[in-house]
Amino acid sequence: MWLGVVTLFPEMFRAVTDFGVTGRAVNKGLLELQTWNPRDFTHDKHKTVDDRPYGGGPGMLMMVQPLRDAIHAAKAAAGDSAKVIYLSPQGRKLTQQGVEELAKSDSLILVCGRYEGVDERIIQTEVDEEWSIGDYVLSGGELPAMTLIDSVSRLVPGVLGKQASAEQDSFSDGLLDCPHYTRPETLDGLDVPAVLLSGNHEHIRRWRLQQSLGRTLLRRPELLENLALTDEQTKLLAQFVDSTNECG
């Protein structure tokens, strides 16, 4: 997968290219990331990239010409098929379903805003989609872009050691993930659930599914509203509710 990023702070993306899962993906050639800095497209000695907004008000906007030229350079490198995404709190909220949609693309260009944002006409003429990682304000689009890159890259074939790792992640099937345990068997008086030590793979599968359903019900019940549960899931969830009521 090819990813282009338009950003005033390309150094921040070393966190993506040099570390962790995404860093290994880059080293394996499964993920390619290039950056374009609007400062490199300025025409004055001060490399100015901000400008005053029409109508006044606090703050500045990203200057149109350097930003637009940087986007055009990224498009030229990516080819016609690349989708241009602007990271914005006004965009569609990023969910696992959205991540799966974006992961089907061969190439993406991510535009990271700064200051008070960008000229609306840039969005109208250069951007295909706006995406948000949540209802809160950040200083720029770089952290949302890195979040999107990390989540999308996990679905690129070969990036994770086992595809099952991605399939078991929270939200991959619309549910939160189940609890996980490793050694020791007892920690501060808390034991690993016996079923996980049983070696019975079917029992373990059902326990994990039930825990996933129950955790979703307790912590993010709205997620269940959008799911058509199977007969097995409905039964397991009912059993979870019954056991929770008995305990408490």
From Swiss-Prot:
Residues the record lists as binding S-adenosyl-L-methionine: G113, I133, G134, D135, Y136, V137, L138
Top-level taxon of origin: Bacteria
A single GO BP: tRNA N1-guanine methylation
Catalytic activity: guanosine(37) in tRNA + S-adenosyl-L-methionine = N(1)-methylguanosine(37) in tRNA + S-adenosyl-L-homocysteine + H(+)
Keywords attached to this entry: Cytoplasm, Methyltransferase, S-adenosyl-L-methionine, Transferase, tRNA processing
EC nos: 2.1.1.228
Annotated Pfam families: tRNA_m1G_MT
GO-annotated molecular function: tRNA (guanine(37)-N1)-methyltransferase activity
Primary site of residence: cytoplasm
Subcellular location: Cytoplasm
Subunit-structure text: Homodimer.
Role summary: Specifically methylates guanosine-37 in various tRNAs.
Family listed: Belongs to the RNA methyltransferase TrmD family.
Protein name: tRNA (guanine-N(1)-)-methyltransferase
Protein source organism: Shewanella woodyi (strain ATCC 51908 / MS32)
Lineage of source species: Bacteria, Pseudomonadati, Pseudomonadota, Gammaproteobacteria, Alteromonadales
Gene: trmD
